[in-house]
């Protein structure tokens, strides 16, 4: 059965990693579990590559912006992140949830999924990036709660 890489990653984070209960998971074992769950070998490989790249974020150091700039999305980026998603990311930057470094990481991870993203999936990518910055749990929990405070009319982060 052919699934998207996004579905494989959802399964990985929701079912496999939550069962690990804080234990470090072996990548080969995770790939094996995903294959046993019925995901295609190619999709499992791409999902594991995405997961490994996410882990390289490491110890993130926030950037203090003195002159905020507006991010213009390239045509390739706009293919994967539609206008609604772009507005969402701009709102997160305005609210201080993302700085330019984190925004670029989110965009890079979104494009790496190689398919246009729904707003819900973009929320998930943002959460995964923030959780992997090495920030304290309190910091990412606060940011995570801000991510979901979205006005349905214009998709800007409410303050």
UniProtKB/Swiss-Prot annotation:
HAMAP family: Smg. It comes from the Bacteria. Pfam families: DUF494. This is Protein Smg homolog. InterPro entries: Smg. It comes from Dichelobacter nodosus (strain VCS1703A). The lineage of its organism: Bacteria, Pseudomonadati, Pseudomonadota, Gammaproteobacteria, Cardiobacteriales. PANTHER family: PROTEIN SMG. Belongs to the Smg family. Disulfide bonds: none annotated.
């Amino acid at each position: 059965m052919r699934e998207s890489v996004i579905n494989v990653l959802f399964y990985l984070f929701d079912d496999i990693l939550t069962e690990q209960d804080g234990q470090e998971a072996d990548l080969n074992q995770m790939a094996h579990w995903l294959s046993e769950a019925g995901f295609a070998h190619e999709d499992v490989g791409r999902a594991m590559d995405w997961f490994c790249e996410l882990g390289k974020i490491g110890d993130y150091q926030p950037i203090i912006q003195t002159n905020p700039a507006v991010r213009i999305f390239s045509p390739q980026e706009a293919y994967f992140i539609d206008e609604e998603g772009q507005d969402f990311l701009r709102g997160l930057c305005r609210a201080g949830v993302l700085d330019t470094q984190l925004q670029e990481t989110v965009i890079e991870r979104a494009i790496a999924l190689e398919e246009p993203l729904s707003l819900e999936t973009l929320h998930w990518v943002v959460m995964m990036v923030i959780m992997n910055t090495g920030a304290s749990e309190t910091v990412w929990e606060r940011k995570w709660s801000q991510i979901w405070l979205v006005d349905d009319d214009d998709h800007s982060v409410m303050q």
